Amino acid sequence: MIRVILCDDHAVVRKGIRDTLTEAVDIEVTGEAASYTEVREVLRHAPCDVMVLDLNLPG
């Protein structure tokens, strides 16, 4: 199982990526974040193998 964290400040983008990824049988979205502050908190509680990261994510 590949564990993924989604990091984007636009909820609609996160939802679209999450909906696409959940169709795969071997991918699990373990967390989501809308800012770098949230990313740090999510990483403490949700392990991941891959992070989908918006490069323009606010602080």
Predicted regions located by residue number:
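Non-catalytic signal-transmission and effector/linker regions of two-component phosphorelay proteins
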Residues: 1-3
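Two-component/phosphorelay signaling modules centered on CheY-like receiver
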Residues: 11-31
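Active-site residues of response regulator receiver
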Residues: 54-55
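Acidic, metal-coordinating helix/loop segments flanking the phosphotransfer/catalytic sites
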Residues: 32-50
